[in-house]
Amino acid sequence: MFMLPILAGNVFQQLYSAVDTIIVGRTLGSDALASVGSIGSLQFLVFGFCSGLAGGVTVVTSQFIGAGKTENARRSTAVIYMIWAVVSLLCTVVGIVCLPGLLHILNMPENLFQRAYAYQLVCFIGLGGQLLYNVESSLLRAIGNSKVPLIFLIISSVLNIILDFVFILVFHMDVVGAAAATILAQSLSGVGCLIYSFRKYPQLRVRKEDFKISFAFLADHLRVGLPLSIQDSITGVGMMVFQSALNGMGADAIAAYTACSKLETFVEMPMYSIAVAMVTFTAQNFGAKQYQRIRKGMKVSLLSCLFFSVVVGGLIIVFCKPLVSIFVGSGAAEVIRLSRIYNSIEASCLWCAALLFTYRGAVQGTGNTKIPMMGGFLELLMRVFAALCLSRIWGFPGLAMAYPLAWIFAALLNMWYYRKLDKNDFQCTRTSLI
């Protein structure tokens, strides 16, 4: 039941992202769609680093809450706010300064450069607001409340859709309007969660003295958070190599990937939501030393993810053309052809993603983030291999194998470590904070 609001929230979050894509693709054309899609890996790299760090340290907060240590939970929350402020500022400044060079690294086609630059510039400017929602929703989930983030996200989703139409169709702001709509909607959602959490939960109601923390306390949080941040950054680097190879294949290939990635994200949402729930569920029960509950939760989560991946993967393969046509229209024949190739490969391997998400979530919940980080390295290697080697041999189909290969190898590592933990009654790892 804890997972259901998380799932609904992720669906709504991807819904307004998909609406952005549909409006851009249908009203501004395939070049505009390709411009937005061509920087997806850069957005993941930056946002993944920031949200991975913030999300990682909330694992510690969850363990404090599970252990009933309210004062430490408040101090942990203060650490999260400090990290959010510093990281948001640094990434915004560095991102804006380095943006032209980053787009050149991505092998950005000349006809897409200006739109891609304008879109990403707005995203960098509003990065702090975007991250605020992720931080607050993670804190609320850490305390066991996954419904309130959903409520604010629904409001944000509706607002985002309205602003999309206003900024793009009324004010003719082009792709900048799509970026501004998303930034504004997510920022308001984050502020709403912040106000609610401060008023409702004493464990999250930080005081001035809570910010007076020792270096050791901060270091213990970073020990958990940094590997997750590095893991997402490594994944982002692999995606940038993938994106660079993709951008060299032209606007049709970029548009096909952009449309397919939106579908893929929707399909992965239930599995990802279960994984997010497993992190909190495992962390709280790990803090309370309820290891048998972790095992039961893992079994239910894994079976649910595998069943979903097989059923929905088959549906994606069968209904690929009408689904992709939602984003680009039925007249984009080459985009649809490439989308069929991509979806056939990805959808048939979704069960690998199910294994990865579930096992990785459980491992992260125990406070061990080094294994998921090592899995991130494996994902990087596989994406680079597909981008630099397989794409040269088989073209677009070879490039499409990047994600399945990444899922398989990272899943094997996390599976091995979880079974090691299970065999030793979860005594292989215990954070020094609990």
Predicted segments, located by residue:
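Transmembrane helical elements of multi-pass membrane transporters/channels
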Residues: 1-20, 122, 133, 156, ...
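Short alpha-helical transmembrane segments in multi-pass integral membrane proteins
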Residues: 1-3, 61-128, 170-226, 282-349, ...
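N-terminal transmembrane alpha-helices
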Residues: 2-28, 41-56, 60, 85-92, ...
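Transmembrane alpha-helix boundary and packing residues in multipass membrane permease domains
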Residues: 6, 10, 22, 59, ...
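Helix-terminus/linker motif at the lipid-water interface of multi-pass membrane proteins
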Residues: 15-34, 103-110, 166-175, 233-262, ...
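Small-residue-rich hydrophobic transmembrane alpha-helices
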Residues: 33-93, 130-149, 256-320, 353-375
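Hydrophobic transmembrane alpha-helices of multi-pass small-molecule transporters
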Residues: 45, 160-165, 190-194, 266-269, ...
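Short runs within selected transmembrane alpha-helices of multi-pass transporters and secretion channels
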Residues: 54, 122-141, 149-157, 178-193, ...
